[in-house]
Amino acid sequence: MTARVRKDSANWRIFGGGAMLAGSVAWLIALLIQAAGQGGEISTWLTIIGFLLLAASGFFLAFGQTGSNGVVGGSVLGKLGFVAFGVGFLLMAIVPLLAALGVALPGELVTVGAILLVVGGIVGAIVTYQKGVARGSARWFFAIPAVVALIWVATTLGWIAIGGNILVTILVIAYAVAGLLFLLNRR
């Protein structure tokens, strides 16, 4: 007899939502430190840790802790979306991580990572809504950071111009709220 997933045993919400919330908070602290003009190694390492936690959240949201079904249920497309989201943040973390250790990688890997996290985030948001594994606002809210990430990548690539760090700050806060909603989900 197999055990059913209950509201207190859905590990995708605990590990995926928790990692997304923790990664967003680390990234937000790094942005605040940079805005205060105190950047340096602390903000670099906080950003790397935040990106690694956000990468882990993508994998946990896709597969749960045990490799079964995550927030997208059994949807292969949804799993691929959240894996692409995770790989995107992993690439964005590896470049500054290796640079801090003295190894230079092409900067285009960050662009590839950003595109992967946007495409994966949009696919993951659509499938999350369709499958209905997440309930309430957690079911639809992930679409907000996915769209904000799309705008962020468009500004990063120079397609549109939005000055300052306001867009990335909004993106980080949106990821934090999405992580919190996943974490507190009642499914």
Which ranges hold each PLM region?
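Hydrophobic, aromatic-enriched alpha-helical segments typical of multi-pass transmembrane helices
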Residues: 2-187
